[in-house]
């Protein structure tokens, strides 16, 4: 039997998501439903789904049961621990729909609690800062894309990343690069990995492209921008700093500290509707 549910469509630096409000936790969102909804020809189309639910209703959640929980699913139906762009859009939705009372609040994720600050917001657009936690540098590894080997820094942001700073790579050459699914060290990354190709730090800025596990290339990846900033700073011999990260979908600001990191960037809610699943 077909089920009709409300949805919203939004994006954060063109990393796009379907928001499914499920405050009463009545929807059994299966992987098959996710794949169908995220299909860009037969469905609504998105890089993933953000289900809005209380942490108390999420199996395996380890956060405060009273928190709103970002139940994030990749476009292939798999569960994902964390999504920095998704958190900004999720926070925008909660605040603009009066599901929270303050501009500063916590959100539950499978990677733990993320604190957010709404810097500006209306029903359609917002600027949001997210406390992304301490980047966990896991070591050095490599990947192969189209027969070219890239060396990178393993960074765990609640989800796994391999951020590859490429010496001498220009922003224009990066834009022209043919990016395909990478092969990687499966012992180093047993649960798969998101791969970022990054230019060297110049004038406190880098350019980045990303291949996300379970999705493919996306226009942006929030956790990936933090991993990229961390790798670029390390490549430049720096332990902390503020980095503008330029992605195909726009720009974000990443701050890396000794004891944490933040991600600041835009969010947009572009459509509301109903869909049969």
Curated annotation (Swiss-Prot):
Its EC number(s): 5.1.1.7
Site positions per UniProt: Could be important to modulate the pK values of the two catalytic cysteine residues: 161, 212
Stored Gene3D superfamilies: Diaminopimelate Epimerase, Chain A, domain 1
GO MF annotation, one: diaminopimelate epimerase activity
Residues engaged in binding substrate: 15, 74, 84-85, 159, 194, 212-213, 222-223
GO cellular component terms, semicolon-separated: cytosol
Pfam families in the record: DAP_epimerase
Keywords attached to this entry: Amino-acid biosynthesis, Cytoplasm, Isomerase, Lysine biosynthesis
GO BP field: lysine biosynthetic process via diaminopimelate
InterPro entries linked to this entry: DAP_epimerase_AS (IPR018510), DAP_epimerase_DapF (IPR001653)
Record SUPFAM superfamilies: Diaminopimelate epimerase-like (SSF54506)
Catalytic activity line of the entry: (2S,6S)-2,6-diaminopimelate = meso-2,6-diaminopimelate
Localization annotation: Cytoplasm
Domain of life: Bacteria
Entry's family note: Belongs to the diaminopimelate epimerase family.
Subunit-structure text: Homodimer.
NCBIfam families (alphabetical): DapF
Record protein name field: Diaminopimelate epimerase
Species this chain originates from: Corynebacterium glutamicum (strain R)
């Amino acid at each position: 039997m077909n089920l009709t549910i409300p949805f919203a469509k939004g994006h954060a630096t063109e990393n796009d998501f379907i928001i499914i409000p499920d405050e009463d936790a009545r929807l059994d969102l299966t992987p098959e439903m996710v794949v169908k909804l995220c299909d860009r020809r037969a469905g609504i189309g998105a890089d993933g789904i953000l289900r809005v639910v209380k942490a108390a209703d999420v199996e395996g959640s380890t956060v405060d049961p009273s928190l709103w929980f970002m139940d994030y699913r990749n476009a292939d139906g798999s569960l994902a621990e964390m999504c920095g762009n998704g958190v900004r859009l999720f926070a925008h939705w909660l605040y603009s729909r009066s599901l929270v009372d303050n501009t500063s609040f916590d959100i539950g994720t499978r990677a733990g609690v993320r604190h957010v600050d709404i810097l500006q917001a209306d029903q359609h657009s917002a600027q949001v800062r997210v406390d992304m936690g301490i980047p966990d540098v896991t070591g050095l590894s490599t990947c192969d894309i189209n027969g070219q080997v890239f060396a990178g820094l393993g960074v765990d942001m609640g989800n796994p990343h391999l951020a590859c700073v490429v010496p001498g790579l220009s922003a224009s050459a990066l834009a022209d690069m043919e990016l395909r699914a990478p092969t990687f060290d499966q012992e180093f990354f047993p649960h798969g990995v998101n791969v970022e190709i990054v230019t060297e730090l110049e004038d406190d800025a880098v350019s980045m492209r990303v291949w996300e596990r379970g999705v493919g290339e996306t226009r942006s990846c929030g956790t990936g921008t933090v991993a990229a900033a961390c790798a670029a700073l390390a490549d430049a011999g720096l332990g902390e700093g503020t980095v503008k990260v330029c992605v195909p979908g726009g720009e974000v600001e990443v701050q890396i500290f000794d004891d944490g990191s933040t991600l600041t960037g835009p969010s947009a809610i572009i459509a509301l509707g109903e869909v049969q699943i």
